Design a protein with these regions (language model features):
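N-terminal accessory interaction module
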Residues: 1-81
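Conserved, mostly hydrophobic/aromatic
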Residues: 96, 121, 125, 129, ...
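Short acidic/polar active-site loop segments enriched in Thr and Asp
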Residues: 127, 185, 252, 327-328
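Phosphate/pyrophosphate-binding loops at sites that engage ATP/ADP/AMP, CoA/4′-phosphopantetheine
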Residues: 242-255
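Conserved beta-strand positions in the central sheet of alpha/beta enzyme cores
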Residues: 41, 63-68, 128-130, 167, ...
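Non-catalytic positions within long, well-ordered alpha-helices that form the structural scaffold/packing
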Residues: 115, 122-123, 180, 247, ...
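Active-site-adjacent loop and "lid" segments of alpha/beta metabolic enzymes
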Residues: 1-23, 33, 103-111, 117, ...
């Protein structure tokens, strides 16, 4: 049987969105009347069709049932967790790399500098701080558990005392368990829960929120000519299978975040397709996390206008994601991104 996918599009925002929802001309995303839509794109492996929501009633019966089912998921409210407020768009995950070799800030925030930077990110408006002790940049190698833990444990302990919400960026179940005992609120495993076969048991044991991240290959090999039949639909199907996997393994809660993994086993075309069509993933019913900050695709697009921090491209991609209803943005330059969001939202009020 042919499989169809539903992508919401043509969004409206702020006061205009509120008015349109009240007049039943648009549908709210996640029950939030400040962002709504009036068109959907129906996709399959060999076709796509853009229609107004009023045209849904004219679809063939089976397809109409599928679309209506998807829309119920898309318009349903998402419950808050891990200090995220999904009534707001977008939430901010501040990046703290306690590594000597991360792609943009390796070695910059070790020891006391890391703790102080985390406080700065939180005071600037981060909902949560994503702490990592192992680089997963392209061509990076796995490090020993002891080394990874030694890089992060002191900072985790100090942040716990200050009650700063922490996300732990790790692939290793032992690190996860130690972090959870120090108050970690979210597990962010870039391997898609497949690096360590004990990960799923730790997540279940402590009933912790977690991300399902997409990556093709591993950090050392992921950029060696990545290929997909259809990058958008392949990754959507991947998430569906991963949800089945975690349910099969006894995880019943819905405190799950999906991250399509920009730059993790994708070339420029793949990344652009994923970001530009990101609203497809709303039909999975879980918050979407995007990490585009300072990524290489910004350099590939900007070419001779590239800069070390890639701040302009990071802000531009963050605002685009916000306009597509992405619930969480993983960013390095928290203050600047939040400033851009505040200005954007203020302009929407009129």
């Amino acid at each position: 049987m042919k499989k169809y996918y539903t992508r919401v599009c043509n969004f409206h925002y702020g006061a205009n969105s509120i008015k349109l929802v009240k007049n039943k001309r648009t549908l709210p995303l996640n029950g939030n009347i400040k962002i709504s839509f009036d068109h959907i794109e129906i996709l399959s492996r060999n076709s796509n069709r853009l229609i107004h929501i009023k045209e849904i009633k004219n679809l063939p019966i089976k397809l109409k049932k599928k679309v209506i089912k998807d829309l119920k998921i898309i318009t349903k409210k998402i419950k808050n967790f891990s200090n995220f407020n999904f009534r707001n768009f977008s939430n901010i995950m501040g990046v703290l790399n306690l590594t000597p070799d991360s792609f943009s800030d390796g070695g910059k925030y070790n020891n006391n500098l890391g703790y102080n930077h985390a406080l700065k990110l939180f005071k600037s408006g981060s909902n949560i701080i994503d702490v990592g002790g192992e680089s997963t940049r392209p061509m990076s190698k796995e490090i020993k558990i002891k080394n990874e833990w030694n890089r992060i444990k002191s900072t985790l302990k100090r942040l716990k005392k200050r009650r700063i919400p922490i996300s732990l960026d790790t692939r290793k179940s032992i690190i996860m368990e130690r972090g959870i005992k120090l108050g970690v609120k979210l597990i962010n495993d870039i391997s898609g829960l497949k690096f360590d076969n004990q990960t799923i048991k730790i997540i279940k044991k402590y009933n912790k929120p977690f991300t399902i991240h997409h990556i093709q290959g591993n950090p050392r090999t992921m950029q060696n000519n990545p290929k997909y039949k259809n990058v958008l639909l392949d990754i959507y199907d991947y998430f569906e299978e991963k949800i089945k996997y975690v349910r099969f393994n006894g995880i019943k809660h819905n405190n799950i975040i999906i991250d399509p993994g920009i730059g993790f086993g994708k070339n420029l075309k793949h990344n652009i397709t994923l970001v530009s069509k990101i609203s497809l993933f709303h039909s999975l019913g879980f918050p979407i996390l995007l990490g585009m900050s300072r990524k290489k695709f910004i350099k590939d697009i900007s070419k001779n206008n590239d800069s070390k921090q890639r701040l302009g491209g990071s802000i531009g991609s963050a605002l685009f994601a916000l306009m597509q209803g992405v619930q969480i943005l993983r960013v390095h330059d928290v203050n600047e991104v939040i400033q851009s969001i505040k200005v954007f939202k203020e302009l929407l009020k009129n």
